[in-house]
Amino acid sequence: MSVTSWFLVSSSGTRHRLPRELIFVGRDECELMLQSRSVDKQHAVINYDQDRDEHWVKDLGSLNGTFVNDVRIPDQKYITLKLNDVIRFGYDSNMYVLERVQHRVPEEALKHEKYTSQLQVSVKVSAPKRGDALPDHTPYCESSQPRPEKGDRRHGAEAVAYRTPLYGQPSWWGEDDSGAPSEDRHQEEPYSERPKDLAQQNGELDSCRAPAEPPDYSFRREPSYFEIPTKETPQPPRLPEVPTQEVPTKDQEAGVGGTAPVVQSHASFTIEFDDCSPGKVKIKDHITKFSLRQRRAPSKETTPVETVSAETKVADWLVQNDPSLLRRDGPGDDRHSTKSDLPVHTRTLKGHKHEDGTQSDSEDPLAKTASVSGASAEASGEQVRLQRQIKRDPQELLHNQQAFVIEFFDGDTPRKKRSQSFTHTPPADPKADKRRGPGTSDRDRPGVSVRATGSSSGPQRASSLKREKTEERLGNTSPVPRASTRSFGSVGRRSRLAQDFMAQCMRDSSPATRPAPEKTPPVLPAPLTPRGASPVTPSTTPPPPTDPQLTKARKQEEDDSLSDAGTYTIETEAQDQEVEEARRMIDQVFGVFESPELSRVSSATFRPVIRGDKDESSDGGMAQRMALLQEFASRAPGMAPQMEQQSLLVPGSPGGQKWVSRWASLADSYSDAGLPEDGPGRRTGEPEGPLPVRTRRLLPQLPSGRADSPAGLEAARRNGPGPPELGSEPANCLIGQEDLDPDSLSDASGSDGGRGPEPGTERQEDLAWVRGRRSPRAPGELVPTSFFIGDQNGEATFPKKSFVGPGEVDGPGRVVQTSPSARDGLYVSSNGRMVIQLRSGRSPEPDPAPPKETLTFARQESFTKEPTSGPPAPGKLPHISSHPLLQDLAAARASRLDFHAQDTHLILKETETALAALEARLRSKSADECDGGSTPRPPEDSLSGDSDVDTASTISLLSGKNGPSPTTPQTPGPQKESPLSPPTVPDPGGATPGSARERMSERQHRPTPADLGPGDTSRRAAMRRGHGSRGSLDWPEEERGSGLAHLPSSNHETPEATLAGRQGPRRKPAAPPPSPAAREEQSRSSATAQKVQQALTRSNSLSTPRPTRASRLRRARLGDASDTEAVDGERGTAANPEPANRAAPEQAKKLTRLDILAMPRKRAGSFTGPSDSETAPARTGFSGRSAELYSTSRKPTIAEARAAAKKAAATAANTGPRQPFSRARPGSARYSSNTRRRQQGSDYTSTSEEEYGSHHSSPKHTRSHASTATQTPRGSSSTRARSQGPRDTDDDEEEPDPYGFIVQTAEIAEIARLSQTLVKDVAILAREIHDVAGDGDSLGSPGPTRSPSLGNVPNTPASTISAREELVQRIPEASLNFQKVPPGSMNSHNLDQNMNDSRDDALTNKTRPRNREEVIFDNLMLNPVSQLSHAIRENTEHLAEKMKVLFQNTGRAWEDLEARINSENEVPILKTSNKEISSILKELRRVQKQLEVINAIVDPSLNLDLLMGNRAPSGSGQPGLGKARPAAQSSTSPASVDTLLPALPLRSFPQRANCGPPGLPEPAFLPDAERFLI
């Protein structure tokens, strides 16, 4: 009889049969259980329409949504699923493809009394039955024929098993009783994922799977749900015997005519009677190798054999299926179903069970246990092999004519279930056997084999994928690599006996051999290359299996990989699986997985790379598969050369970062599209890619060497001693990477990641070279990971896999895109989803591969600070990718840099253009991703939002690419030189490109207070300038801010000169393209970027990663503005730096000030780092996230974004320090902190760099720059630096004078407005920062109120009071030091009030138009605020250190602190018209006080060196604050502001000095501020 069955085939190849009833999908107690933490407990419902024979999916209002074809479906609304629809639940790395299979139940089987009774029993024990069927089916993945066969059996068994699950119970309910069915089902799920992936990758899967499915479906589905298959069913199935024989494809590829091939289940299905569970019958398609393999090869001609086989096989299976013998699936079956029934599966789930009781699909304890089976290692290995083969290689089983799988199930220890298979047929394929040689190994790394095979044969890939995985485990140890033709081991698999023997042998020998495969899959010995290594099989060769325990561990890992879907695969070696898994899951969640390579190397066992790939399960296997994939990029853990092609590893490749969290892998899971790009390697990686796709969400991998995801070229070039190593094509990417390199940790990587080699490949190569030489870390040295979130379209996708630099220390763990194109180095998902390029490395220069082009936003937030070991070549601008937009930006940036030297405004405009280009790239990527069915946003958010890593970094990367990236590569030397030599101004055009980068670098390296002497005004100005567009770490921006006042006069030329000099030296290497051309290019880029940004925004909004705590806090603070929304808006707005470009996004996504402010904050405030310039140092100091986020903050619409950015910059500056300290988040607060240091001047001045450079030109220009710089440059120093140019231009465009030098009045007005906005933003951000960062309890308390009312920081009583108190405290200090702008301060306050009015009409509309005084005052106020924030940050930092040292003292310290803080709060509110500023200052003061108290408490005697060091710089300001506080409180806002500015700079300066770069500019800032005020 023919039955139609619907299956959800997961990217891992696991097939889930969809019952004709409503099933729940979720993490807990659901019929379809996913392990991804992004999947809600009850995420979605899949219902069945009997009339139309179609399934519906309805999202149950899940947090992360359900995506059909990468489009998020509305909640609570049924969406009809069509054939081949791709469904994703939350950010589960598994994508499920809906497939339909027409299954014919073999007449023989149905007639068979035993079978019928078993079916009936199965119906009773539906769960077990289904489980059985599933595993059976899984084997079919190996070959299309086996798959149908599996389908047949599976249909019967699964149908019964999957009869109608009780509501709330998984359909496999009861499977655990038999254990085998559960295992089958568990396996099925992973396999389904894999086939689905395969299907996505190849049509093969469909073809292979479809036929398999049809038989499976018909047989299984009808009987299982509606009736116990009786003898009626057998006859129809019997008919399709011949067709069944043929390799079933959806098309019935083997020639089954038009009808779906009816796979006769005679050999297809095994009926296992489980003695353990009386009612349980497992119908498996691995009945006998008897005919399965034959059928497969001679699909059509197999009919006769099949006919005979049907009966024979039924009999054989009945014999074999002695419940005890065939109880292969034991608790392992639960693996598949473990997802829901914890109680039942507890034993089974042991070691795989997640805390929530879910078990990853690939966490098949049974299989693992089988491998490990203590009873008999051999039996265990054999069992694993057999199980894997059975599940995955039914055909192979059939191929071995008669394979009797006898499973010895240890009832007491399900995991110890051993299966022995006796094959009466001579070994069919030594290769297959080898491939499967060590059953356990193969099982351990199913992904490897599957991937390898997948590449070799499309059709097989789908069905084989899983099988191969199993096989790989089974046959890893096999000496002979599996033939490529037998993708999944269905080709020439040895007899079970031979395989078992091989498994034993391999087990004996594997311990020695396994490490090699782990390290160098490509180099694996032939035995080690059963799958991946064999040339036929493009995929990486599976590592040889190791001892049974290792095999078991590997098997578990494989299982874990399978469950990667939403779960964190935990690879367990021989260690306690539960413990290992728990650890790994935790690590994954935190993106801290040891590099798979490392772990692999460390553990002989091939540990699955936890990268969210199904293949991830087995490191070796995956690594091997990857090896083929990335043969050149062999990601062997042992491969020290980062240049190894590993960088080409597919993001999803097993080599991917282990650290990839499932969330990260989610993003990775969409790197399928990119995979194919690699051609055979890629293709090989394709299965890998999809698998990775499902799990691959790489969190930054610190330990691994830099992974330059771009092609190995990029990796090589990065690793290469010099630029020559870089390939010309990758060179572009390299530039991007290089751009990132200097500050790759900081925003530089991220922001610049999106930019292609703007000046040229040469520059990128230089950058790569410089980066290589400047980064001290050895090639093998781990590089800080950078995430690039990009799209295929926008090459800036996050390479899901970390791009392994030359060494690819990550090796297997860090899968780099296999695609040769370095630009696409970021692995792009086939869906066009952004791939996360995870470049992990300790090196401060994660050098996020820019392979993705502009879109590749390197996640700047590397976990390690990038030590700018060598000055990156100035020409080595951080061009993250060679994306055309980026390239355009490169030219634009070069020109912009020239403009920078020439005109800060132009630079700003250029920066905006660059931002626009980045945004365009992002948007285009986003669009592509959307088209591809993937959304870059989830990966971005995912990285940032899903993972503990702050979402800001990802968002910032996407949105701004945060200009810092270009700066990042800047050579510290050139940077410093640049500021040192204002004369470089003459070299604005030529030096500009270099200078921007150098500025960033400079900012990074310049942090030394000595670097920027107060006397070195020009140099300081230059620094400021450099920092301005990129956001300066130092106070240059602040100096700029103060300089803004005096800039027009004395520092006026110096800033420009310095800026030019600075930029010139920095960007000097980059050929300065004609500013007009560059600008045009940038404009184009901007337009494109806008689109990209919009697309990204859409994508982000479409599939946003699960919000992190910070994002939730932000959301709560922001109210309706959600993290994603804020980021999207921020991105959209910021991404459109140019007025036109910007207008659309700006208007389209008009962000409220709060939204804008929240954006950087939203991005965990990590990226709140003032700007790229800030980001670079910030990143260096912290992650780049704050800066990048900040960047994003500044990216909003020119006016709004500018103001908001200004505010955000100020606020971020305030927030940054605070947040970093309050919030331990490195990416969020710390980045912000450094950023804020630079930003304090720049943000508050808002024109630190821009105003500095532009102020000398013209107030208006300064104004524009201020806003733009604050928004854009601050946000993304390098990208922003580019953006700044464009934005400046935009500002200019907004204002008649393009350069803005002429229109001083307009600029002043603009400045006033921006200052107003900035002040408000600062207040708002301060509130939010307090809330989120919880810097101080006092801050935290006001934070919530503050956060909601962006404009009403002062309005909010708590926040206002806190802020005001802080202001009062600070302002008195400031007043004492500086009382020169009473009118300005008043105006500033008025302006601020205006801002408030704009935000809240409640605030009196004071002078909306601002005078220069007002603007200056605002800047001054903001500068103090920024400085205050910086001081707070410093204090907090020191405090944190001290507390670490003296945590035991914190108890009493906190009490004292509380008292002191409370007393501080008592400080009278500053009487200023600018309530926001007052509140901000007060809050900051309060926070600082808290920090001071904490410091005092921690080290009351101030004995600690940290304390002393902090006190010295911090104390200078703090004591003054304390003393000045009363005066400030009493003093009015003007005096307070005036006083505050000087005092704060002084105060902040010491702190900054402690911090390093920020401190340097501060002295200059004070003079600047004074001058400005004067």
UniProtKB/Swiss-Prot annotation:
Residue spans crossing the bilayer: none
GO cellular component annotations of the record: cytoplasm; microtubule
Origin: domain of life: Eukaryota
Organism: Mus musculus (Mouse)
Residue stretches of biased makeup (Basic and acidic residues): 147-157, 182-197, 325-344, 430-446, 465-474, 996-1005
Compositional bias segments (type: Low complexity): 370-382, 1134-1146, 1199-1213
Swiss-Prot/TrEMBL keywords: Cytoplasm, Cytoskeleton, Microtubule, Phosphoprotein
Family classification: Belongs to the CEP170 family.
InterPro entries xref list: Cent_Immune-Sig_Mod, CEP170_C, FHA_dom, SMAD_FHA_dom_sf
Protein name: Centrosomal protein of 170 kDa protein B
Residues that bear Phosphothreonine: T540, T541, T1289, T1345
Annotated ranges, domain FHA: 23-73
Biased composition annotated in UniProt, kind: Pro residues: 518-528
Function text: Plays a role in microtubule organization.
